[in-house]
Amino acid sequence: MTILKEMEYTTEKTIEVIAKGEMLGFEWFVISYGTHPCCYIKIPEDHELFEVDYRDYYDNDIHINCHGGITYSANRLLDGLDDGWYIGWDYTHLGDYHAMIEPWGRKYPVSVLVADVTEVICDL
């Protein structure tokens, strides 16, 4: 596991990997978008969730316990990262900090974000 820097909340939209690692065969990334963080896990090709769109989870009785639920699945994440199948979730829900929407909301330190990723990977 590598924590590159702490989450710094801003009003400017930026994209920066602030933590990354590998656990139990899953690569993972915590990305700051400036206004909020998101967590992503790369799903291996031999895993049952590979290429399953997150919008189909309910119909397939797939439940992943993460902050606000899975809100992303795609075969690409960011320039400079290997293509593959990624799932992810964001921290911009009701009660979460967002400079332009909820400036009084909760801010998440990178240690909490990494702990959340670890829990999801253990559940996968």
Residue ranges of predicted features:
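Acidic interaction surfaces
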Residues: 1-124
